[in-house]
Amino acid sequence: MTLVYEGKAKRVYSTDEDHVFRIEYKDEVTAGNGAKKDNMAGKGRLNNLITSYFFERLARQGLESHFIKKLSDTEQLVKAVTIIPLEVVVRNYAAGSIVKRLGFDKGVQFKSPLVEFYYKEDALNDPIITDDHVKLLGIADDDDIAELKRQALIINDMLVKMMDEMNLQLIDFKIEFGKDQDGNILLADEISPDTCRIWDKDTKENFDKDVYREDTGSLIDTYTQFYNKLEAL
């Protein structure tokens, strides 16, 4: 078993099986592209359990991802994919960067979900880019762009319904995709409070990493509460 890649939140290892990786979730938490960074015991476990729950439920509803199975509280087995260097963001309500960028009032619901692409390049601070930029950079062609948007909106519909079952609002989220050995585009990376913005419908309390970004509460307590809500479904 060899370390293939290490990022801010995960380590990726090779396995004895071709085209299969083992992912280990770390206890590190970052914000602002790593400008703020801490180690919090139990964070990796929570994100792995939450992501595994979402990927398993999405699979039952027909949405394929790189996820194969949960190996332990902090580990997953996944299909090897070549990550497409885009963060695909879906916004249902105005919050975060779009409020600063375009002047929307925080919490305003969009008439329909908005899909945005961000170029995954730390040196450039992951800039927002258009479909034409995606093509000029050689990241994806028209067909792949359409497929990324199609899957992102399907995932959004599924997640919105799950959040609704917990009396929560899915404000926005970011996901990543990769291509398998056959060129199929698959959901990859994770879906967790690290990558979603989630509010309580009544109190507007955060159930996401904003509690860490804004120093408004305990990240571990918040993620634990969210996981407990998932388990109760």
Swiss-Prot record:
Pathway: Purine metabolism; IMP biosynthesis via de novo pathway; 5-amino-1-(5-phospho-D-ribosyl)imidazole-4-carboxamide from 5-amino-1-(5-phospho-D-ribosyl)imidazole-4-carboxylate: step 1/2. It is an enzyme of class 6 (ligase). Keywords: ATP-binding, Ligase, Nucleotide-binding, Purine biosynthesis. It catalyses: 5-amino-1-(5-phospho-D-ribosyl)imidazole-4-carboxylate + L-aspartate + ATP = (2S)-2-[5-amino-1-(5-phospho-beta-D-ribosyl)imidazole-4-carboxamido]succinate + ADP + phosphate + 2 H(+). Its EC number is 6.3.2.6. Pfam families: SAICAR_synt. GO terms for molecular function: ATP binding; phosphoribosylaminoimidazolesuccinocarboxamide synthase activity. GO terms for biological process: 'de novo' IMP biosynthetic process; cobalamin biosynthetic process. InterPro entries: SAICAR_synt/ADE2_N, SAICAR_synt_PurC, SAICAR_synth, SAICAR_synthetase, SAICAR_synthetase_CS. NCBIfam families: purC. Belongs to the SAICAR synthetase family. This is Phosphoribosylaminoimidazole-succinocarboxamide synthase. The lineage of its organism: Bacteria, Bacillati, Bacillota, Bacilli, Bacillales.
